[in-house]
Amino acid sequence: MAKTTTLPTILTAAAVALCAHSATLAGGGVTLQPKAGDPLVGLSKQQTALFWAGRLAYATPFGPETGLGPVMNKSNCQSCHSNPVGGWGSIAVTRFGIDDKGEFLPLEELGGSLLQALSISVGCREEIPVEATVVATRMTNSSMAFGLIEAIPDAAIAANEDPLDADGDGISGRVHWVLPLEDSPTSPLRAGRFGWKAQVATVLSFSADATRNEMGITNSLIPTETAPNGDMALLAACDAVADPEDVPDAEGHAFIDRVTHFQRYLAQPPQTPRSGMTGEQVFNAIGCNACHVAQWTTANLPGLEDAIRGKTIRPYSDFLVHDMGLLADGVQEGDANEQEFRTPVLWNLRTRDPMLHDGSASGGTFEERVAIAIAKHGPFGEGAASAAAFAKLSATQRSQLFAFLGSLGRNEYDFDANQLVDTLDLQVMAQCRLANTVTADDACAIGDVNQDGLVDSVDMQGFLLAAERDGVDITGDCDKDGTPDFVAIFNGAPDVDLNGVPDNCAPACPADLSGDGAVNAGDLAIMLNAWGTAAADLDGNGSTGGADLAILLGAWGPC
């Protein structure tokens, strides 16, 4: 890295103490983005409690005695939405039906179109009917920031549709208008935005649908049970719990309410750096932004929570359905035909494996998965031009594009992308402190969180907050000089063994082996137990012996 002789201001101990005890995850001008799976910033105390209660419900399995089944795909939401909790998953479900001269028939009378692959007993099991001529795999979608997505006005989504491709750009996305389950039949249709076919418009509808269809739990919005392969006699024999099975708890919330709270209050995943990457220009240049619309603003309605109302979000989706050519799976849902899919959001993309609705871009590196996913947008359908343009990119342009897409879901300061801000990342921060200028395309941009072109003391305050949030102890001060060890290392102290303690640290009271602020019987016991080893070596000869005992006794008393 380039080095500068004018280094940023050294972080003071007072500033560290201030940011270390911050409850808002902000300090010195740096406000951390929530991690994927965290609650929204700005929730009230009551809303935060609803989020955590909902998260618990989301992860808690149902049993047959509480209504599970008789046929289902999983016993709890987290089993599918697991990366992180509420996010993408690697669990697949199966859709089936008949292709009748180009028209999809869902075989509802035989349990279609969703196969429930599990059952509470062998005798209640559901199978793909022999009549089915269409069988399709669907991967688990993400529930990240559902409340923010739900709050995008219908009119804003509709403003982007161009079903007849009037502008001739090859993109003819359209709104999938649907009726929420909680609305009356005479209510106006809403712009669908959830599900692979945008077949769901509200979070409550999504919760009710998944609760019944994926877990077999009937509820107030879908009070009838799924019969195994449509066999009502088998249903009567297998299902002993009265419907609806989801009833309000002691606080008046049904299960579908609880998981709706959780999904609505999930935060927008991070994007690091937040803007300015050349790869986003490449993304736009090859036409990806025609469908993957970066930015939206949620409605400014008085009925919305403060944490949701009037917020700018960057999901990278238009929430329209598009003809996806060879990616078509032959399944129709609602008004979305066999070739159409909703543009998936891209936030938290870097953690997604597999990619695509059928999981066909899986394994390998992130870059390999992305390359496969983009290539599969062609050679036919609305994504074909972008797929062709991607194939013509230079190696440098591809790298820039991959770096940008990899920023979607990257945590700030997490240089090694292991989902933990720790001493390994601290070493990189210390190196980045010496850089003359940091751009959004530099590796050091992950530490330049306020994007002022320097990794300095302000960014270090944010680093300490991020490390503390991840459960790392940032309070160590080996020489008791008032400057935390992490700050000393950031400012240039060596830490070759990466333990978060400066290698040249001289403890203010080396004979205080127990660290209780005094040299006493406890330290003597430690030394005697370490006799003959290096564990209590005070004179630096590599062994604990008489000379070390003399040093300890000479220092007896308070440090």
Predicted regions and their residues:
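Bacterial N-terminal signal peptides that target proteins for export
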Residues: 2-11
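Intrinsically disordered, low-complexity segments
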Residues: 7, 20, 226-227, 512
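Bacterial N-terminal signal peptides
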Residues: 10-21
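Secretory pathway export signals and precursors
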Residues: 15, 73-76, 120, 234, ...
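Cellulosome-associated attachment modules in secreted, modular CAZymes
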Residues: 410-559
